[in-house]
Design a protein with these regions (language model features):
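SIR2/sirtuin-family catalytic core signature
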Residues: 1-20, 25-35, 41-54, 194, ...
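Active-site periphery "cap/insert" segments of enzyme catalytic domains
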Residues: 2-4, 8-11, 20, 58-211, ...
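Short coil/turn segments at secondary-structure boundaries
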Residues: 23-24, 171, 215-217
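Amphipathic alpha-helical scaffolding segments
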Residues: 25-34, 164, 220-225
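Acidic, metal/cofactor-coordinating or nucleic-acid-engaging core segments within structured domains
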Residues: 48-52, 229-284
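Extended, charge-rich helix/loop segments that form flexible
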Residues: 85-98, 102, 106-115, 222-257
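Short, flexible helix-coil linker/hinge segments at the edges of structured domains or between repeats
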Residues: 173-188, 219-235
Length: 402
């Protein structure tokens, strides 16, 4: 039975889904580009040409590091270039404020830019949905992990991933989508806060179960841009678009509505329901959690790092487990090289002093590094390997006083 007096915050990142079959960045990009080339409207409208131009321009811009032109940066560029459109006769509210300083210098039509961005979202959603149906590994260890958390505390799982491996492993976790309709559920913010002490799973950046419930019989409770939860992935993907017109931003541009959040302006998109409630709740979760577990996150989402920092700046700091992957599962060897954005964030945002060799204890258990002073532990052999070694995990929790 769940222990209501103790809370565990679990933050899930992209690396946690790779073991189950979500493609890594290189393969994901290749699959995305195949989808774009198969999208007839994208081809006819010049969207594929726009995608190639943006990607090639970014690759040249990044010089010796062309891989930095990844799909999130490409999408962001396409979206912002399309948004930087000046409409004749527009009132100041709808004139991009930076237009006179940053007039776009390209020959691409607005239609092509929007078609490319639209096709990218559709492709990303499809790849995540298809991959969710074909798990590469058994979900049993993940099921056991969630059950183990529930035996000792109230686990609140916040994931930045679109896939549904966690809900497959443990169906029925609370999501906040409690207003039942014929074929879908709508989000209820009051229920999200009322059910604060029940185990939950919350998709911070969207899900393969999210869609826009427009069309058919009008629902008086559905406004433009509202998202619904569809139990069937096959049904949800039919509703990936249809959120209506874009949402106005204060700088005179528009934010295109989408069932999933990608690109570099994630924080701006979190104002949409249910994300507004989820993000508001997350800032409370980090302060009430008795233990924080970060799974497979490269710590690239700065708005989430800011939340985690709140808990790690307390005295004493909230205990934290960080599960990642380093070559050969050897964090100590990896630290002999240059620090990366990930390891820098571990030091500054998670407050794990991994560079202090006097405090770090390596190898007390296979794959683990522990800093008892910081009440922190790092697992370096990947998420699926972590799931298969519950005995070591239990001992580590004792070491960091969690």
């Amino acid at each position: 039975m769940t222990n209501p007096s103790k809370r565990i915050l679990v933050l899930v990142g992209a690396g946690a889904s790779v073991d189950f079959g979500i493609p890594q960045t290189k393969d994901f990009t290749a699959a995305l580009e195949r989808e774009l080339q198969d999208d007839q409207y994208c081809l006819e409208s010049g969207g594929w040409e726009a995608y190639q131009w943006v990607k090639n321009t970014l690759e040249k811009y990044y010089g010796d590091e062309p891989w930095e032109a990844h799909f999130e940066r490409v999408y962001h560029s396409l979206h912002e270039l399309a948004a930087m459109k000046l409409i004749d006769g527009a009132v100041p509210k709808y004139k991009p404020v930076l237009y006179p300083f940053l007039k776009p210098e390209h020959a691409l039509e607005d239609r092509a830019l929007r078609a490319a961005a639209h096709a990218m979202l559709k492709a990303i959603y499809k790849i995540a949905s298809t991959s969710s149906a074909l798990s590469k590994h058994s979900l049993n260890p993940l099921t056991a992990f969630i059950k183990g958390l529930m035996e000792n505390a109230v686990p609140r799982i916040y994931t930045t991933n679109y896939d549904d491996f966690f809900s497959q492993a443990y169906p029925g976790l609370f999501t906040g989508f409690t207003n039942k309709r014929d074929g879908y559920n709508l989000f209820n913010p009051k229920d999200y806060w009322a059910e604060w002490n029940v185990p939950g799973l919350f998709h911070l950046h969207g899900s393969v179960h999210f869609g826009f419930p427009l069309g058919g019989t009008p629902d008086p409770d559905v406004d433009i841009g509202d998202l619904a939860w569809y139990e069937s992935r096959e049904e949800a993907i039919k509703h990936v678009h249809g959120g209506g017109s874009g949402k106005a931003r204060l700088d005179g541009t528009q934010l295109e509505r989408s069932a999933i959040i990608t690109g570099l302006d994630k924080l701006g998109r979190l104002q949409q329901s249910p994300y507004l409630s989820y993000y508001g709740g997350l800032t409370r979760e980090v302060n009430e959690a008795d233990l924080i577990i970060v799974l497979g996150s490269g710590l690239g989402d700065l708005h989430l790092n800011t939340c985690l920092l709140q808990a790690r700046r307390t005295c004493p700091p909230t205990p934290i487990i960080y599960v990642g992957w380093w070559k050969d599962g050897d964090l100590r060897e990896a630290l002999r090289g240059d620090l990366t954005d990930q390891t820098i964030a571990m030091v500054h945002d998670l407050r794990i002093d991994i560079c202090n060799r006097a405090q770090m204890q390596f190898g007390s258990y296979p794959g683990w590094a522990v800093n008892t002073n910081a009440r922190a532990a790092i697992y370096a052999k990947g998420f699926y390997s972590f799931l298969q070694d519950s005995a070591s995990f239990a001992q580590i929790l004792k070491q960091i006083e969690a």
